[in-house]
Amino acid sequence: MRNAQQYIESLRDGREVYIHGERVEDITQHPSLRKAIDHGALDYELDKRPELRDLLVTKSPRTGNEIRRYFEMPRSAEDLLRRQELIETTTRADASWVVFMKEIGTDALNALNMVCDDIDKKYGTEYASRVMKYWQYLEEHDLSMAGAVTDAKGDRRLRPSEQEMPYYYLKVVERRPDGVVVKGCKVHTTSSPITNELFVLPTRAMAESDRDYSIAFGIPVNTPGVKIISRPERGDLAEFDYPLSARHTTLEAMTIFEDVFVPNERIFMNGEWEFAGPLANCFATWHRFTGISYKYPFSQMMIGVSALVADYNGVPRASHIQDRITDLVIYAQCIKTFGRAAATQCIITDNGVAYPNPLLCNIGKYLFASGYHTSMKAVQEIAGGLPATGPTEADCKNPATKELIERYLGGRKGVDAISRLKVMKLVRDMGGTDGAGEWWVGTLHGEGSLQAQRMSISREYDVKKCVDYVKTLLEVK
C-alpha cells in the first residue's frame, strides 16, 4: 500500500487542471489545490495509526496482500456494517470532513460489479471481467478515484439525444476496433483534480435514441483530452478563524472530455441503453449509503459544539437549549439508524454482493439532507451572534486589542475569551464561511437531490401492499 508522499508524487503526471483562471502545471505546489491534496493524503496516513489499522486494512482474496478495506467486496450485512464504520471512522478522524479518495470510486465499482453481470447475460459481453481486472489494478496500485456521473444536462425537459447542443451529456462520437472516443462534460465531480483515476457513469435512464450517451468507463485523470476546471478554493486561511476549512476541503470540478480515447479494456457499458438507468440507480444507492455513513460524525459535531457553547455561555440546562440539543440528537440518530438498517436489511444479489437496502438508503439520505438546514439553525440559535461578529486571531494577538478581547469576551466563570472564541469559530466554519456554503449546497444535492430520493422511495416502496391491506380490512374490492 502507498503512503501519503507516494500519493502526492503520483499527482505530478501532466494532468490539465485549471483554478482561479490559470492552468496549474504542478498541482502539488498550488496552495489552494495543496490543501485538498493534504486532506486527501490523510487516506494514506490513517492506516499507520495502530488503533485504526485493523479497520482500514484487510487481505486481498485474490493475492493475499494487504489492501485498503475500501476495496473489500461486501458479501454480508456484517461487511456493510464494517464499510459504514470505515467511512464513519475515517471521516471523524478528518474533523468530520469526508476524504473522498476511495469512497466514491468503490461505490462505482460495486455498482458496476452488479449491473455488468446483467449486461453480459443479455449481450454476451465481457464487461464484468473487465470490471474485476480494473478492480484488481486499482487495488494493487492503491489508487485514488473520482466519480464523474452528473452531466451538464442543458435543457432538463429534453432527453440527451434531443438537446440542441449534442454534448450536454457525455457522448460517444467515434467507435473504433480498439475503443471509443467521447466528448462532453461531467459536473460536480468531487476530487477529480487530485485523484488518480476517473470513473464515468451515466447519470440517468436512457432511451434507445440515447444509445451513444449510454457509456461507462474508467481512465487515468491525465488521459489526453481530459480538462478539469476546479471550483475556487482559498489556501491561505488561518486555523484559529477557520478550524475546519483551513486544513480540510474536498474539491469539486467541471471535468471535460475533449475527444478522449477510451480503450476497450476500460469500457464497462457501450450503447446498452436499457441498463443506463439501473446502473445510475445502483450507484446512487451505494453512494447514498456512503452519504449516510459520513454525515453521522458531522451530526455528532453539531451536538458537541452546541452543548459546549451552551456550557461556556453558562446556560447548559436552560430548557430551550435542551430542546434544541434533543432535536440534534434525534437528527443524528435517525442518520445512524437508517445506515445500520440499510446494512442489516441488505439484499444479497445473484452474484453474491451484499447490496444496501435501496429504500432505507434513500429515506436515510432524504432525512439528513432535508433536516440539515434546520439542524444548523439550531446550532446557530444556541451560539448566538458571536460566530458571525467575533474578532479574528490577529485581533487576539494585537497588543492594542488583546487585553480588551480577553476582558469582555469571556464566558461563565473559568472560561476565558480565547477558548470561547475558538468554539464560536467552529460554529462559524460549520455554518457561515465559504467552506460551510459548500456543505449547505452539497448536503442537499450531493448523492442526488431531494427529488431524486423521493422518486427512488416511491419506486421502492410497495404501496399496493398497503392498499390490499385496507381492502382486506374493509372487505371491499
Model-derived features: positions:
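Acidic/polar, glycine-rich intrinsically disordered N-terminal extensions of enzymes
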Residues: 1-60
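Generic structural signal for well-ordered, non-transmembrane alpha-helical segments
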Residues: 34, 38, 136-139, 297-300, ...
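A structural signal for well-ordered alpha-helices, especially hydrophobic packing surfaces
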Residues: 41-44, 310, 332, 336-339, ...
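Glycine-rich flavin
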Residues: 58-197, 203-217, 222, 227
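FAD-binding core of flavoproteins
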Residues: 147, 152-293, 458-477
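Extended amphipathic alpha-helical segments enriched in small hydrophobics
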Residues: 290-349
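Short, charged, amphipathic alpha-helical segments
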Residues: 322-326, 354-362
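Alpha-helix capping/hinge segments and adjacent helical runs
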Residues: 359-477
